């Protein structure tokens, strides 16, 4: 019976590792391609040719052309840079901000903890995308403002995770010994607290990449993100939605790109969570 349990555990571990390798490779390939997208496009993504406007997919233009005769494949490839880079930047910002607030609350405690946690409660009580729409509406359109708007409402989750982990570490015997040794607060946080709480925070960040990508695309679709003619998947869908019935390939192309990218990052996040779960190592 023990051998059977061990065998099942081994199969589970190997399966999780295989998934981790597969989705890591796919995610890295997606990120690398987005950064070198200008070298991968078969045509200039900004080049207009009204003679072939709204052309259906052909051998020369596998994804067809848009209303201005621009090659859709080139637009989708070029749009990966703005879509993926802005998503990674957003997740990095909210992870850093939320972790900083959470560690501060957990370590300092008292009034600081109470005030910052009540502020986070306010943000958590309001539907995220609705609040982001309001912030983006005040700041105005643009990809930078969309990132600021989503960052403003997305950090509380990370703050709560970092705070709970910091409180747990703060009460351990070895941490009390470190504090009694006379080490400075900054050194303790950087050397002892952050390395021990970063795991759950990073897992949450990986799971959030797909969500943030969709929310950025949603803001762009509503006209509050990237502005034409900059190729960005959400704004490309918004710019072509009136052609959905007559030239559906123009709208479907960036939509499929969003779907595939979100699926890859979501599956990678799920796999990292499974890999970090102690049960998967039994």
Locate predicted features.
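C-terminal transmembrane helix and the adjacent membrane-cytosol boundary/short C-terminal tail
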Residues: 153, 199-209, 248-282
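Glycine-rich helix-loop "coupling/hinge" segments at transmembrane-helix boundaries
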Residues: 136-138, 150, 165-166, 214-257
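Transmembrane alpha-helix signature in integral membrane proteins
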Residues: 72-107
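Short helix-to-coil transition segments within interhelical loops
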Residues: 65-70, 107-108, 167, 177-187, ...
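Loop-to-helix entry region at the N-terminal start of transmembrane alpha-helices
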Residues: 74-87, 137-157, 249-255
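N-terminal signal-anchor/first transmembrane alpha helix
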Residues: 1-43, 119, 197
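Generic hydrophobic transmembrane alpha-helix motif, especially the helices
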Residues: 62, 66, 97-98, 106-168, ...
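Hydrophobic alpha-helical transmembrane segments of membrane transport/permease proteins
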Residues: 31-68, 222-230
